[in-house]
Amino acid sequence: MSLIKSSVFMFSMLTIAVSANAKGPKVSYDHAGITAIDHKNEAQVKWVSAESIQKELKGKPPITVSFDIDDTVLVSSQCFYYGKQTFSPDSLDYLHNQAYWDFVADGCDNYSIPKESAKKLIDMHQARGDQVIFITGRTPHRLHKAGQMDQLARILERAFHIKNMKPINYTHDKPIAPYKYDKTRFMVENRVSIHYGDSNDDILAAREAGIRGIRVIRSATSTNRPLPLNGGYGEEVVEDSSY
C-alpha cells in the first residue's frame, strides 16, 4: 500500500471510530489531504482563497453563503474544554446536557476568537452583495425561540460586521428527514450556494444539498479531535484558514 493510500486509510478509520458527536453517516476518505499539523500531501489538495473565489464569482449575481461556527469562524475550544471539565470530565455527555448549552449561550463566546481567514471570506462575500448566514450543530439556550436574534448572533454580527444579520440556524446536531446530515435542511431552505465548514459533515451535508462545500482548516489547538483530513473527499480547501 502506498504512503498516500495508507494515510487516507488510517484517517478514514479514525474518522469512523472517534467522531463521536456528528450524527450523519460516516464516509471514508478517498483522497489524500492535510491537517493543521500534517501538510505532507499539500500538493494534492485543491486550494482556494478569498481572492480566487471572488474571481470565479465575478459577474454573477449575489448568492447566499453559509458558515459553520465552531472552528470555522470562531476559535471556541475554551467553551468546550470548560464544559467537558465541568459537566462530564470522563465523557462527551456534556454535549447532550442543556445546562452546558445554556452556559455557552449566556456569553461564553464573548471570549471566543474570530478567525482572520473567516473575516477575509466574509468581507469578500459581503463586498459582492452576498447574504451571509450561519448554521451550527449547537443547541441553543432553553429559552431561545426559533427566529430570535440571540447573543451569539449579536457577537458574530459585531465581530464580522455582518450586514442584514439573520438569526442563527441551530441544528441541535440532529438530521431532519429526508436528509441524512443535520445542516442539509438549512442549506436547502435558505437556498445556499456555498457552505464553509471545518468538519466532514459540513462537506457531506453540502454535497447532500447539491451545493459547493469548501473546507476550512480546523486549528491545531482545537479540542475537537481527531483533526479532519482537509481535502480527504476531494473538496476545495481554503488556504491559511487554520487561524
Swiss-Prot record:
Alphabetical list of InterPro entries matching this protein: Acid_phosphat_B-like, HAD-like_sf, HAD-SF_ppase_IIIB_AphA, HAD_sf
EC number(s) on file: 3.1.3.2
Entry's cofactor comment: Binds 1 Mg(2+) ion per subunit.
Catalytic activity: a phosphate monoester + H2O = an alcohol + phosphate
Domain of life the protein comes from: Bacteria
Major place of residence: periplasm
One Gene Ontology term of the molecular function aspect: metal ion binding
Enzyme class: hydrolase
Keywords: Hydrolase, Magnesium, Metal-binding, Periplasm, Signal
Binding positions (Mg(2+)): 68, 70, 198
UniProt cofactor(s): Mg(2+)
Cellular compartments annotated: Periplasm
Binding, substrate: 136-137, 183
Residues at the active site: 68 (nucleophile), 70 (proton donor)
GO cellular component, one term: outer membrane-bounded periplasmic space
Signal peptide span: 1-22
UniProt xrefs under NCBIfam families: AphA
Similarity annotation: Belongs to the class B bacterial acid phosphatase family.
Role played: Dephosphorylates several organic phosphate monoesters. Also has a phosphotransferase activity catalyzing the transfer of low-energy phosphate groups from organic phosphate monoesters to free hydroxyl groups of various organic compounds.
Subunit-structure text: Homotetramer.
Name assigned to this protein: Class B acid phosphatase
Organism: Actinobacillus succinogenes (strain ATCC 55618 / DSM 22257 / CCUG 43843 / 130Z)
Gene: aphA
